Amino acid sequence: KYYIMKWLSDYVREFGIDGYRVDTVKHTNEDVWKDFKKVCDQAFAEFKLNNPDKVLDKNTPFFTVGEVYGYGISGKQIYDFGDKKVNYFQNGFTSLINFDFKGDANKSYEEIFSNYDKILHQDLTGKTVMNYATSHDDGWPFDKERKRTYETATKLLLAPGISQIYYGDETGRKLII
């Protein structure tokens, strides 16, 4: 595991990569990600120190977003495996992909925005989520027929958190083949 951490942190140290998106996070022990974040934080600090002319914001920390399949903002900081509960935010992640959004998008703007704002400012202070409406990992997207593209875009782009645009979301590309 340390070989891979070294390899990935070398990209940070050499090129100034400021964040990673990690796929299938829950298939590895959670403490691995805490160690990985520490290694990347150190590499990013070294890059900034050695390349002050390339630094866009000296106070921005290294960013990690994780795909914990099934995690939703409604769980706040906890992902429940059934036999154990894990806080991935305390184990190296700045953000997690929010699998709740595609269902929450059926709610009113006010309901989505108020709820997400409350959770992000009370339960996830200093952390965030990445919302999506469609994904290659998910067979139950919001607006599968693409009849509500403006509503999808508005809710996705204005909801508190980060917006993940899946190829075709921006053009209304067909999801049903």
Where are the model-predicted features located?
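Acidic/polar loop patches that form or flank catalytic/metal-binding clefts of enzymes
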Residues: 163-169
